[in-house]
Amino acid sequence: MPACSVTDIRSHVVEDSLPDQVIKGLKSSPKTLPALLFYSNEGLDHWNHHVSQPDFYPRHQEVDILKQRGDEMARAIAPNSVILDLGSANLEKVVHLLKALEAQGKDVTYFALDISAPQLEVTLNEIPTSEFRHVRFAGLHGTFEDGLRWISETPHICDLPHCVLLLGLTIGNFSRASAATFLGNIASQALRGASKDQSSILMSLDSCKVPTQILRAYTSNGVEPFALQSLTFAKTLLRGPMLHNDSDEPLPCYLQPDDWYYHSEWNFVLGRHEASLIPRYRDVHLGSLLQDITVKKDEKIRFGCSYKYDDMERHQLFLDAGVEQDVAWTNEGCDVVIYELKKRSNTEKLGIDRN
């Protein structure tokens, strides 16, 4: 099989707006950093090391479900489907589903979407293409929004059956209101067209709200280097568009990893894990490159949240997004569940749990 092709579907270069995003986030309350800062190759290496640790239950549970239930999931995907993987950091999980599709002789095309071109290349190079005859592979370089526009507007794609993969607990990275909006947007753009009745979303959610289990997971080995690498990457990216003052000297930017702690906490009220960076010793003055913003000692710069969903919150999410559960796959003792979602019909039907 020939090498996997990659199509650049970006509507704009995301990095161009990064300086404004960083400054806006650092001026907000609470202070935040944009997710793009964590997409360096080094950062992703640290992340993959972190999520492979024994205490990081979300990944292990999701992989086990795909291993044990992949054949059932594959049967739910229509022949000739376009499978769009939103954020395909690596293939360790989804390869079990793809192998099940191959074993069933289903002709489908898997599109790996990633905002990072280098990471996308790594992902595609990991695919053992010689093992597949029925499953074809390609890459899409762009954002979530670019991917949804592509699947809904591309002439030879829009009327085929669609299966959108939203794994890795990605939906948990959004606030509950934003998650419903995003999921509804996926449904409105991907679950339409001539084959809409054969189209679906496969999405994972985590129901764990045990603080000790969550904090062990999100403080396991590798997470602190992952968080701190974002500061080094930020300086590299920021000094492109905002490099010099009138004297042609580089503008100062004080984002030294040694000056910061990684901070992990469970928010009982909002039902989410929160990840932040906090000054280690004293107030940190970020320099003129970042408009002389000061971060007070013990002040948090939040860079990530992971919302957990109990039954009521999950039901509300699906209701607000205009989708309904068709099937749910999990294993005994698991907090993670993978749901097959369809666009909501006028009459809501009951989901079937396969435990």
From Swiss-Prot:
- What's the catalysed reaction? 4-(3-methylbut-2-enyl)-L-tryptophan + S-adenosyl-L-methionine = 4-(3-methylbut-2-enyl)-L-abrine + S-adenosyl-L-homocysteine + H(+)
Q: Which InterPro entries match?
A: EgtD_Methyltrsf_superfamily, MeTrfase_dom, MeTrfase_EgtD-like, SAM-dependent_MTases_sf, SAM_MeTrfase_EasF-type_put
Q: Quote the pathway field.
A: Alkaloid biosynthesis; ergot alkaloid biosynthesis
**GO process terms (BP):** indole alkaloid biosynthetic process; methylation
- Provide the assembly information: Homodimer.
- Record-linked PANTHER family: ERGOTHIONEINE BIOSYNTHESIS PROTEIN 1
Family, according to the entry, reads as follows: Belongs to the methyltransferase superfamily.
Q: What job does this protein perform?
A: 4-dimethylallyltryptophan N-methyltransferase; part of the gene cluster that mediates the biosynthesis of fungal ergot alkaloid. DmaW catalyzes the first step of ergot alkaloid biosynthesis by condensing dimethylallyl diphosphate (DMAP) and tryptophan to form 4-dimethylallyl-L-tryptophan. The second step is catalyzed by the methyltransferase easF that methylates 4-dimethylallyl-L-tryptophan in the presence of S-adenosyl-L-methionine, resulting in the formation of 4-dimethylallyl-L-abrine.
What is this protein called in UniProt? 4-dimethylallyltryptophan N-methyltransferase easF
Organism this protein belongs to: Claviceps fusiformis
**Lineage, please?**
Eukaryota, Fungi, Dikarya, Ascomycota, Pezizomycotina
